[in-house]
């Protein structure tokens, strides 16, 4: 009897590790860029497949970035030092208009993706690519689809349309056939990311922004890993993918607290220090003995400043344009003014009847469950039914109810005008902004106390 012995050599398939460092909702906070750059460089010394993603909202929040001569340029210069590989646009990227956004994209070494951002012919902004591919040395191809929230100020981008991100993503299901790993790089918020994962199982990972959510270990929805890393560059996200035979066999996420890191990239930190040293933002222009406890107190100050600047009876400011939730007692600097409101919206003067003012307020409430229009010159009460629907708005000034037959001078910024005054005759646009009005107001009122100020009431019928 003959026995044949067959030898089988088992070749174990090698695995590849991919690391994606991500940031979202930085809003001009540049102080930790030195630490981030050092951290990324250390990872790249350890392994070859390290990428850096930006999930939107680079600007609006720090005057050294927002008020630079070339608006937004400092943060792009710092990003290029890291460097970033892929970016999606946040809604705030559109706040400086189409031409400035185009200049920032041209300045950046990062690839910008935005599948649902559509530019009309003649726009200074040119369509970004909807997606891009990253290829590993083993041949694995990673597809990255970009999606952006539609909550920008449409009046600033008349030639750009931002269409529904989830519906748009569904049109790119075929992208999965062209890559082995598929990532959505989004600025649509955690809830929308969850909806996207539910409706479209093609994504292995969604790297998100917009809602400023901290997801310490990420969340799994429909087998998709959803990540987000807070805001203001306090953290970076670290997504790790384990790939075997060109397919993901493991994925995980952690948030890295940059404030706990000690190593700093010297070149990047010198650039950060250069920008932070800008002297004009350190000038003290006022003080507040009790501070501001909430947005309404800050918004009331801003509305008073707008009313004074435009010489009107009534003025409104929007909660979206108050970037601080509260403000401590003490000095107020020029930098603080541009942090409280970082938008540079022009101020507009209208002549409105009480009925038209009610319509303005009612429209604003339909977009939010809470009052969002802070006011000067009057108080108003929202009268709601048990379902929370506004049935009436009462308006009073210091003399009592407004005269229904009179037109009042009313001031507001272009954001409020664009969203709630579409069907009204255009107002008179001025060169003033909320920031300049605040600076002028503090020249005449260097000490401001708005503690306990409340001009809005809600009454249930």
State where each predicted segment sits:
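Short, motif-level signal for alpha-helix interfacial/capping segments enriched in acidic residues
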Residues: 2, 6, 34-35, 188, ...
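General secondary-structure edge motif
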Residues: 1-2, 58-59, 156, 221, ...
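Acidic, metal/ion-coordinating pockets
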Residues: 14-264, 297-305, 351, 366-373, ...
């Amino acid at each position: 009897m003959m026995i044949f012995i067959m030898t089988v050599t088992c070749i174990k398939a090698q695995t590849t590790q991919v690391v994606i460092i991500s940031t979202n909702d930085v809003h001009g906070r540049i102080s930790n860029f030195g630490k981030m750059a050092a951290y990324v460089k250390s990872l790249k010394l350890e392994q070859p497949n390290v990428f850096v993603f930006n999930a939107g909202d680079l600007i609006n929040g720090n005057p050294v970035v927002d008020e630079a001569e070339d608006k937004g340029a400092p943060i792009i210069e710092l990003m290029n030092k890291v460097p970033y590989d892929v970016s999606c646009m946040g809604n705030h990227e559109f706040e400086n208009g189409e031409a400035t956004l185009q200049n920032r994209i041209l300045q950046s070494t990062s690839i910008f993706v935005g599948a649902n951002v559509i530019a009309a012919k003649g726009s200074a902004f040119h369509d970004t690519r909807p997606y891009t591919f990253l290829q590993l040395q083993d041949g694995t191809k990673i597809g990255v689809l970009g999606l952006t929230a539609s909550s920008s100020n449409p009046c600033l981008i008349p030639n750009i349309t931002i269409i529904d991100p989830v519906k748009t993503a569904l049109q790119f299901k075929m992208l999965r056939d062209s890559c082995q790993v598929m990532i959505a790089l989004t600025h649509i918020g955690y809830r929308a990311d969850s909806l996207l994962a539910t409706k479209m199982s093609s994504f292995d990972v969604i790297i998100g922004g917009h809602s400023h959510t901290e997801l310490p270990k990420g969340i799994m929805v429909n087998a998709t890993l959803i990540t987000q890393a807070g805001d203001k560059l306090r953290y970076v996200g670290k997504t790790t993918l384990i790939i075997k035979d060109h397919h993901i066999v493991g994925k995980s996420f952690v948030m890295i607290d940059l404030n706990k890191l000690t190593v700093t990239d010297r070149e990047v930190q010198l650039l950060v220090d250069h920008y932070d040293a800008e002297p004009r933002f350190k000038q003290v222009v006022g003080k507040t003995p009790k501070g501001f406890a909430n947005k309404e107190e800050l918004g009331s100050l801003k509305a008073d400043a707008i009313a004074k600047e435009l010489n009107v009876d009534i003025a409104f400011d929007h909660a979206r344009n108050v970037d601080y939730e509260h403000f401590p007692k003490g000095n107020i600097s020029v930098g603080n003014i541009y942090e409280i409101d970082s938008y540079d919206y022009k101020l507009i003067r209208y002549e409105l009847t009480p009925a038209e003012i009610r319509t303005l307020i009612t429209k604003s409430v339909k977009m939010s469950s809470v009052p969002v229009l802070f006011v000067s010159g009057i108080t108003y009460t929202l009268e709601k039914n048990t379902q929370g629907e506004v049935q009436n708005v009462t308006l009073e000034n210091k003399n009592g109810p407004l005269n229904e037959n009179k037109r009042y001078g009313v001031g507001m910024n272009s954001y409020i005008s664009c969203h709630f005054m579409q069907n009204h005759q255009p107002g008179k646009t001025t060169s003033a902004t909320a920031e300049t009005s605040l600076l002028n107001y503090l020249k005449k009122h260097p000490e401001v106390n708005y503690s306990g100020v409340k001009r809005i009431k809600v009454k249930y019928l």
